[in-house]
Amino acid sequence: MTRRLVVIGNGMAATRLVQRLVERDPARFAITVVGDEPHPAYNRIQLSPLLAGEKTAAQIPLLPAEWYTRHGVCLRSGEAVDEVDIQQRRLRIAETWLPWDELVFATGSRPFIPPLPGIDRPQVMPFRTLADVERILAIPGPAVVIGGGVLGVEAAAALRRHGGEVTLLHRGSGLMAPLTDAFAADELRQQLEARGIRCVLACSIAAID
């Protein structure tokens, strides 16, 4: 008997899971995918090239829309799960209850937002989703990137490609630690500064004005 499988999340892991399930046994599950982003599933790794203008939004979807229709997968984009009832095996989306036999959480991670005064200003935003990229690109002028990890470095480099002033703030003494040693971190800093990116290391942020 076909079982009802609901996947909460429409990111890269969820999409790959659904693809494999359909490939292995298309009749085993009636699959529903629920994702709170209004866009089709996309390659999140490509957000930095998108921010830099090297890619377009049309180039980063993981699957075409017709794939879901062709394989009988129900895709509910732009919808958030408000409640999960484990006992009755159902979940609530707004006022609608959706039953399931098997449930998969594939929601991914969330960026850490430091609890700083001024963090809620409209010009302050994370760098995690396609909507974040659209919001960042909509605001002209100098940019400050908080965090010198992989995404922070990529975001700073991408923003600099647009010609604006970019400052990268990092609380550690070396960029992209622990992926880099002291020599590599310093070489990376020099490369960024050669591109015109100001790097401020070993700093702490008290507030955003």
What are these regions (language model features)?
Residues 1-6, 61-144:
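FAD-binding core/adjacent interface of flavoenzyme oxidoreductases
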Residues 113-114, 153-154, 177:
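Glycine/Thr-rich phosphate-binding loops of Rossmann-like dinucleotide-binding domains
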Residues 9-12, 128, 146-151:
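Glycine-rich Rossmann-fold phosphate-binding loop(s) that bind the pyrophosphate
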Residues 34, 78-80, 127, 150, ...:
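Conserved beta-strand termini and adjacent loop/short-helix elements that scaffold enzyme active sites
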